[in-house]
Amino acid sequence: MTFSVQETLFSLLRLNGISGHESSIANVMQHAFEQQAKDVWRDRLGNVVARYGSDKSDALRLMIFAHMDEVGFMVRKIEPSGFLRFERVGGPAQITMPGSIVTLAGCSGDIMGCIGIKAYHFAKGDERTQPPALDKLWIDIGAKDKADAERMGIQVGTPVTLYNPPHCLGNDLVCSKALDDRLGCTALLGVAEALASTPLDIAVFLVASVQEEFNIRGIVPVLRRVRPDLAIGIDITPSCDTPDLQDYSDVRVNHGVGITCLNYHGRGTLAGLITPPRLLRMLETTAHENNIPVQREVAPGVITETGYIQVELDGIPCASLSIPCRYTHSPAEVASLRDLADCIRLLTALANMSPEQFPIDPETGATQEARP
């Protein structure tokens, strides 16, 4: 079977799943994993885990993960007029909300809607140039009143996702909602396909995780069951090749996988990852040996599950691979199929390494300690 990066990515992008509502994506991931993996399970929180490679109890355990959920909204109140008030789930870009088309997961099926905006003809002053506060926004589904909205299947708690089906742009770029992080999910499936018939010296656990966009900790139950020796996350990172960001960093689309040196959220002390130098060397050496382009990144304002994984159990060495993405958390994110394919190649090369090539121990550079 030939793995198609574009077809797989587009099929995942057409699915909807805000944090806590990832089941449609999880079903696809689980079914795909079950075709070749030695063991597959879904935990009570919704994480999907697949095991490949060595069955030995003392085998080095590499965990590779990406999150299934996307940013979106949830209905907070149905107005008597039938318009819907809502809250953000995760961090969708508020500046892009007015005028956006959305999909609501109604009780009887999906319902289309749009986020209303004051008629430009009647807008005055800042109303014409500044995005309204969240409590000034509403969703219009065409309901004539509250009872009509309820008959259409809407209730408090109805999940809402941005609507923008995937499109191809020039130079192997794609535009869609939810590239964060269906790119990573696609990478997991690409690695799964590559490992299906390959004997490995290590145990590889591929994890499609939940609730990253909401609390960044949905993957924690998996760690405590798998107990990995090393974890590598796959996520997007802001591409800085647009006119507004080109002076900020050199990370750009179509120039390879990003290797995170540093990321953090908030003011730097809340959570983040400083990748151990020995892991940076391992990633860059492996990429060089396999002619895979990579680019280093320092990304303040970005955080992934690695910020919390690293302090679990006895400490878990972590690294992050990033796929550069323009217009993050908007309805129209843009990323490169080439970069995604390179990410799959690098992860596959890592999975095929021998245990001795993984620098687990910080003092000696040794591999994992013998398991009790």
Swiss-Prot record:
The active site is at residue 212. InterPro entries: Peptidase_M42, Peptidase_M42_aminopept, Peptidase_M42_dom2. It comes from the Bacteria. Its EC number is 3.4.11.-. It holds the Pfam family Peptidase_M42. A divalent metal cation 1 binds at residues 67, 180, 235. Binds 2 divalent metal cations per subunit. GO terms for biological process: proteolysis. Its cofactor is a divalent metal cation. GO terms for molecular function: aminopeptidase activity; metal ion binding; metallopeptidase activity. The keyword Glycoprotein does not apply. Keywords: Aminopeptidase, Hydrolase, Metal-binding, Metalloprotease, Protease. It is an enzyme of class 3 (hydrolase). A divalent metal cation 2 binds at residues 180, 213, 329. Belongs to the peptidase M42 family. This is Putative aminopeptidase SgcX. The lineage of its organism: Bacteria, Pseudomonadati, Pseudomonadota, Gammaproteobacteria, Enterobacterales. The gene is sgcX.
